[in-house]
Every structure is written in C-alpha cells, then in structure tokens.
Amino acid sequence: MQCALYDAGRCRSCQWITQLIPEQLSAKTADLKNLLADFSVEEWCESVSGPEQGFRNKAKMVVSGSVEKPLLGMLHRDGTPEDLCDCPLYPSSFAPVFAALKPFIARAGLTPYNVARKRGELKYILLTESQSDGGMMLRFVLRSETKLAQLRKALPWLQEQLPQLKVITANIQPIHMAIMEGETEIYLTEQQALAERFNDVPLWIRPQSFFQTNPVVASQLYATARDWVRQLPVKHMWDLFCGVGGFGLHCATPDMQLTGIEIAPEAIACAKQSAAELGLTRLQFQALDSTQFATTQGEVPELVLVNPPRRGIGKPLCDYLSTMAPRFIIYSSCNAQTMTKDIRELSGYRIERVQLFDMFPHTAHYEVLTLLVKQ
C-alpha cells in the first residue's frame, strides 16, 4: 500500500506497510503457530484477509492546531500535531466529512484542546460509518459543556452539508489525560444508534459500544463462528464479552437458548434491539461482568463463546470453565499471546480448529478464532 504520510516519515502506525499482504500473512501465521507450538492442533484453516486500504469504518482523530485552522489526526510523542485526513486506511467517503468539519469547528468556535497548556475544548473527533447504508455517527469529545450551546446552534449548517450524519453526539471528557471518551454522552440528534448489517444480521452501533473496525473481515469472522457452531450439537450457549452481540446473533437459531453478557449497557441495548428485529425470543442479553456472571451460574451450556479484550479471559474464568467443563469453547481473540496463556489454564481441552483473520493489515496484530473441545 502506498502512503504519502509514511513515505514522508510523518506517520509510522502501519509498521509493516512495506511488506506485501501475503508476506504479512505468512509472518502472522508463523507467529500464531509458534505461540501454539506446545499444543496439538487438529486443523489449521486458511487465513482470511480483506482489502489492504480503505477498509476502516472508524476514524479517531485528535483535534489540534487553532480554531481557524484545526488539524485532525494525532500528536507525536513530542507533542507535534500531524494531520491524518489523507490516511489511506480510511474510505473515500471520509474525505468530504473531514473537509466540512474543519470550517465547522471555526463556525462553532470549538477551540482545539491544547495538551501542553491544558486549555481549549475540542479534544477528539470520532467518526463511524455503516457499510450497509453509508450512514455515519459523529462524536465531538469536549472538555466540558461550555461550548455545547454554540455547537447546537451551528449544527444545522453541518447537517445540511453532510446529510449522511445520522447520529451526532457530544461526549464530555474533563480529565487531562489521553482518554478517548468520558462517561457523559449528549445526543444532538433524534437517532441514537447507527444501523449496520453483516450477513443479513441486523447490528446496531451506539456511541459507547465496541464495534470491529474492519467490517469486511469482521463479517467473515462472525460467519465462520456461525458455521462452526452449526456443525456442533448445541442447544444452549453463552456469548461472553458479547459487545453488540455480533457472535451470538449470528450463531443463534430459533430453538437455541443463548445468553449474551457484556459489561457495557450501550452495547447490550444494541444487542437487544437486533434480537427483537430477528424475532429470536430465546436470546437473553445482560449488562454484567462476564466473569462474575459465569462463575455464579449453576447450569452449564454445551458451548461457551468468549471474545475478551486484549488482556484475555483471565485465571478465575479459566478455572471456572475447567471445573464446569462445557463440551465446547470457541475463543475469539485479538491477542494470541493472552489466548495461549488462557488455553494453558483450561485443563482437559484439545484444540480442534484454528483460523487467523487479518483484521489489522500493515501491523503485527491479527484476530484468531479457536475451537476447543473437551477431551
């Protein structure tokens, strides 16, 4: 992939950009096989990859510069700002949004936050696009509510320029730290969730719910999990760390009992909305801590699907699953190192199947799906 920002030495986020995609996939596969070298893996499935550029559905832009000439991008370690509006990972549909946002910031008087001086209001711009209809969600991350009235007043101009903006919010993040968002979300539009669709499954994206950034590969990941589950004798499953319900909603059948657990209430609201649309009445989604939920249950499903954050599922949940011994575990991981550590803690399971998904091209990161079967 050609990138003027990389060639000019202005951005080094894509550390593997000089390697061809097949070379990147080979290196990632070798890394995964090395991590799982102590285990017997029955089947290595072919790796899945997607487009090498224009694939991201989300932009997280630090706002810097001045109110008259804002920069959208990132800050280098020395505090120097870098405009990333031309990043080739973003789809072409993002360019007109960035182009309209710069004069809008001036119109609304949203002074960019200056980290060194601890002054200013606008910290980040967060943009998400739906692949199904091109609708977008725009979030202004502000230090306080000081400029909220000005933002509301100027908003009709932006909506006229960009009718694709379906959901617009102001997120209040008052802490002087590199934290992307605060707890308070103020909706500036009537619509509060962005409609998405993968493999004919309706999904919803709300401001504070996690959603995969590579929709082409994510939809293949969910479809693969569904295919694996359909091959198993499963009538009851748990979907832990379920997010907006992507895995559970794909895997569920009308006669299957499924419980999805996620700590973020916003994500659970999305999952419930999707389940209602699909008419799946035996699905239950609850906003709870996944480990706490699992370890207080008396009954055990045939299948537990886990999709934890980078830290993995951790020893308490591993110990519980080892004791309760569900027949199958499907582990989806964005960090194969912590997944490997967790699998070591899961006693009495063999690895039936492993598949790598290249969710993050041009970096060392990847997603992996693993099927574990009780011995």
UniProtKB/Swiss-Prot annotation:
Reaction equation(s) it catalyzes: uridine(747) in 23S rRNA + S-adenosyl-L-methionine = 5-methyluridine(747) in 23S rRNA + S-adenosyl-L-homocysteine + H(+)
UniProt GO molecular function: 4 iron, 4 sulfur cluster binding; iron ion binding; rRNA (uridine-C5-)-methyltransferase activity
Keywords: 4Fe-4S, Iron, Iron-sulfur, Metal-binding, Methyltransferase, rRNA processing, S-adenosyl-L-methionine, Transferase
Top-rank lineage group of the source organism: Bacteria
InterPro entries reported in the protein's UniProt record: 23SrRNA_MeTrfase_RlmC, MeTrfase_TrmA_AS, MeTrfase_TrmA_CS, SAM-dependent_MTases_sf, U5_MeTrfase_fam
Gene Ontology BP annotations: rRNA base methylation
Enzyme class: transferase
Keyword Magnesium: no
Ligand binding ([4Fe-4S] cluster): 3, 11, 14, 87
EC number(s) given by UniProt: 2.1.1.189
Residue numbers binding S-adenosyl-L-methionine: 212, 241, 262, 307
Catalytic residue list: 334
HAMAP family found in the cross-reference section: 23SrRNA_methyltr_RlmC (MF_01012)
Function: Catalyzes the formation of 5-methyl-uridine at position 747 (m5U747) in 23S rRNA.
Family: Belongs to the class I-like SAM-binding methyltransferase superfamily. RNA M5U methyltransferase family. RlmC subfamily.
PANTHER family from the UniProt entry: RNA M5U METHYLTRANSFERASE, TRNA (URACIL(54)-C(5))-METHYLTRANSFERASE
Name of the protein: 23S rRNA (uracil(747)-C(5))-methyltransferase RlmC
Organism field: Escherichia fergusonii (strain ATCC 35469 / DSM 13698 / CCUG 18766 / IAM 14443 / JCM 21226 / LMG 7866 / NBRC 102419 / NCTC 12128 / CDC 0568-73)
